[in-house]
From Swiss-Prot:
This is Uncharacterized protein MG377. It comes from Mycoplasma genitalium (strain ATCC 33530 / DSM 19775 / NCTC 10195 / G37) (Mycoplasmoides genitalium). GO terms for biological process: protein folding; protein transport. Gene3D superfamilies: Trigger factor, C-terminal domain.
């Protein structure tokens, strides 16, 4: 999680975690699904198609619940986005992620990334979410057991070790965010107009 942000988020009122969030659509971006499919196959070469399908379905649902929860949480904050920080994120997106989108879309994605980081920093402190060295080592060991790939570089390289910790904190924050709300699915099957 980015902790040295120049942008600012100010909580305007207490977050109402007892609110039921309405989910009326499930979004599944083909590029997002393919990215996760490749990541899973790279880690678990012998993954059965049914297990892969189950995992991808789980990822899509989790992503949709998280997005709905974040849309709710963000409404409780006021943001001051630092222009230089926004420019850096936009440039990074253009270079590494979003190749064919228009400027307005890229700008919107960049703002969401910054807001998510700011909200995560706030909530991580509020919820006291931490990941110890022992947990990071255990996850690295489990990865080795499942894949038989060399993990020494993750144990010996402080930057890679901290990268694993950051990924684990982010995953815990996603799950905590989802678990703080109740959701109601109202999937009527209507096509967007």
């Amino acid at each position: 999680m980015a902790t040295n942000l120049k942008s600012i988020a100010k909580l305007q009122k207490p977050i109402q975690y007892d609110k039921v969030i309405e989910v009326d659509r499930i979004f599944a971006d083909p590029a997002f699904i393919e990215q996760h499919r490749q990541r899973i196959l790279a880690s678990f070469k012998d993954a059965k198609e049914s297990a892969l399908y189950h995992e991808l379905t789980h990822i899509v649902i989790k992503d949709n619940l998280f997005s709905a929860a974040m849309n709710e949480i963000v409404s409780y904050f006021e943001f001051q986005i630092n222009p230089e920080e926004l420019k850096n994120v936009v440039e990074g997106l253009k270079r590494d992620v979003v190749k064919d989108a228009d400027e307005k879309t890229i700008q919107s994605i960049a703002e969401k990334i910054i807001k998510k980081a700011l909200v995560f920093n706030f909530l991580q402190k509020e919820w006291k979410v931490e990941v110890s060295d022992d947990i990071v080592k255990r996850v690295i060991s489990l990865y080795y057991e499942k894949t038989n790939q060399n993990v020494r570089e993750y144990l010996d390289d402080k930057q890679k070790f901290e990268g694993i910790r950051t990924a684990l904190i982010e995953e815990r924050m996603v799950l905590e965010t989802i678990n703080h709300f109740k959701f109601h699915f109202n999937l009527t099957g209507q096509l967007p107009s």
